[in-house]
Amino acid sequence: MGASEHVPPITSKAEFQEKVLNAKGFVVVDCFATWCGPCKAIAPTVEKFAQTYTDASFYQIDVDELSEVAAELGIRAMPTFLLFKDGQKVSDVVGANPGALEAGIKALLA
């Protein structure tokens, strides 16, 4: 995996609070694990979406590094994409499904 400039990592609970829960606007959170093959497979697509849908902020959470946050969010499978508007989760997409993720992002920004 590895973070990119378009999909930076969130590395603490406080940072998650600041960048996601306290954020105004649209946020997409990619919950992944370094050992997750499908997470690696969809990573370039997530990067592309982050560059395409610039009205949303994109972040990554390593569920093993931030297990407490992942548990609070109810993450049970990777990848899981959480879509937030003004700090409230409005939907999620479970699995490495580019079509479903793009549809979710478009609905979020509509």
UniProtKB/Swiss-Prot annotation:
One of its GO terms (molecular function) is protein-disulfide reductase activity. Belongs to the thioredoxin family. Pfam families: Thioredoxin. It comes from Emericella nidulans (strain FGSC A4 / ATCC 38163 / CBS 112.46 / NRRL 194 / M139) (Aspergillus nidulans). NCBIfam families: thioredoxin. The record marks 37-38 as: Contributes to redox potential value. Residues 2-110 form the Thioredoxin domain. Keywords: Disulfide bond, Electron transport, Redox-active center, Transport. The keyword Calcium does not apply. InterPro entries: Thioredoxin, Thioredoxin-like_sf, Thioredoxin_CS, Thioredoxin_domain. Disulfide bonds join 36-39. It comes from the Eukaryota. The record marks 30 as: Deprotonates C-terminal active site Cys. Participates in various redox reactions through the reversible oxidation of its active center dithiol to a disulfide and catalyzes dithiol-disulfide exchange reactions. The active site is at residues 36, 39. This is Thioredoxin. Gene3D superfamilies: Glutaredoxin.
